[in-house]
């Protein structure tokens, strides 16, 4: 760990204390995990504390950990992951908060802390079904009106549930249940012995 990261780690531990569930360093960046109950207050502290001053939210995304690693994940399924930047101190931190309920994943919105979180949270809601409590306009942002489900969840079928096609009789685009025929996605290619001048 570099001196700069050690200084940041010390400042985080001092400012946040027992709100830190875990703090790890990997690939030159610190990842902080906090409980959902402490999330909003932690984010305010990260922005307002003079020793930290994370003025900018760079990114916020959802993650579905149900098939993480070797598929034997045993923790909460959904998390919101934020990347913060301190322009003043020139350092970054990643903050992860797990939603306590897998069936209805809810975490606090940080739109009141960084207004840049608005569309990021809408995207995580749309694609993962993460509900951000206190968000001023939590509605879908990428999928179509009436879309059913959340397409980035690991249990969402790759083909989806409905498909869209043009109906020449009705002269408009219609939705219908997905009709998929079993097919080989990667064709088996058998090359001749002397293919490309190579000898086997």
Curated annotation (Swiss-Prot):
<keyword id="KW-0813">Transport</keyword>
<keyword id="KW-0997">Cell inner membrane</keyword>
<dbReference type="InterPro" id="IPR001268">
    <property type="entry name" value="NADH_UbQ_OxRdtase_30kDa_su"/>
</dbReference>
<comment type="subunit">
    <text>NDH-1 is composed of 14 different subunits. Subunits NuoB, C, D, E, F, and G constitute the peripheral sector of the complex.</text>
</comment>
<dbReference type="InterPro" id="IPR020396">
    <property type="entry name" value="NADH_UbQ_OxRdtase_CS"/>
</dbReference>
<keyword id="KW-0830">Ubiquinone</keyword>
<protein>
    <recommendedName>
        <fullName>NADH-quinone oxidoreductase subunit C</fullName>
        <ecNumber>7.1.1.-</ecNumber>
    </recommendedName>
</protein>
<keyword id="KW-1003">Cell membrane</keyword>
<keyword id="KW-0520">NAD</keyword>
<dbReference type="GO" id="GO:0050136">
    <property type="term" value="F:NADH:ubiquinone reductase (non-electrogenic) activity"/>
</dbReference>
<dbReference type="InterPro" id="IPR010218">
    <property type="entry name" value="NADH_DH_suC"/>
</dbReference>
<dbReference type="GO" id="GO:0048038">
    <property type="term" value="F:quinone binding"/>
</dbReference>
<keyword id="KW-0874">Quinone</keyword>
<comment type="function">
    <text>NDH-1 shuttles electrons from NADH, via FMN and iron-sulfur (Fe-S) centers, to quinones in the respiratory chain. The immediate electron acceptor for the enzyme in this species is believed to be ubiquinone. Couples the redox reaction to proton translocation (for every two electrons transferred, four hydrogen ions are translocated across the cytoplasmic membrane), and thus conserves the redox energy in a proton gradient.</text>
</comment>
<keyword id="KW-0472">Membrane</keyword>
<dbReference type="InterPro" id="IPR037232">
    <property type="entry name" value="NADH_quin_OxRdtase_su_C/D-like"/>
</dbReference>
<dbReference type="Pfam" id="PF00329">
    <property type="entry name" value="Complex1_30kDa"/>
</dbReference>
<keyword id="KW-1278">Translocase</keyword>
<dbReference type="GO" id="GO:0005886">
    <property type="term" value="C:plasma membrane"/>
</dbReference>
<dbReference type="GO" id="GO:0008137">
    <property type="term" value="F:NADH dehydrogenase (ubiquinone) activity"/>
</dbReference>
<comment type="similarity">
    <text>Belongs to the complex I 30 kDa subunit family.</text>
</comment>
């Amino acid at each position: 760990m570099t001196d700069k990261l050690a200084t940041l780690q010390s400042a985080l531990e001092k400012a946040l204390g027992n709100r830190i569930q875990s703090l790890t360093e990997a690939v030159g960046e610190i990842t902080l995990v906090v409980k959902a109950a402490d999330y909003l207050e932690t984010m305010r502290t990260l922005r307002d504390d003079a020793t930290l001053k994370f003025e900018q939210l760079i990114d916020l995304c959802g993650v579905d950990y149900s098939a993480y690693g070797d598929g034997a994940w045993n923790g909460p399924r959904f998390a919101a992951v934020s990347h913060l930047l301190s322009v003043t101190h020139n350092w970054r931190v990643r903050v992860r908060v797990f939603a306590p309920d897998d069936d209805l994943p809810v975490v606090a919105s940080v739109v009141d802390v960084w207004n840049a979180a608005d569309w990021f949270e809408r995207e995580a809601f749309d694609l993962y079904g993460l509900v951000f409590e206190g968000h001023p306009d939590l509605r879908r942002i990428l999928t179509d009106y009436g879309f059913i489900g959340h397409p980035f969840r690991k249990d969402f079928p790759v083909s989806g549930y409905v498909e869209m096609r043009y109906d020449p009789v009705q002269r408009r685009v219609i939705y219908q249940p997905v009709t998929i025929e079993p097919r080989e996605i990667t064709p088996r290619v058998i090359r001749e012995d002397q293919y490309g001048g190579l000898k086997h």
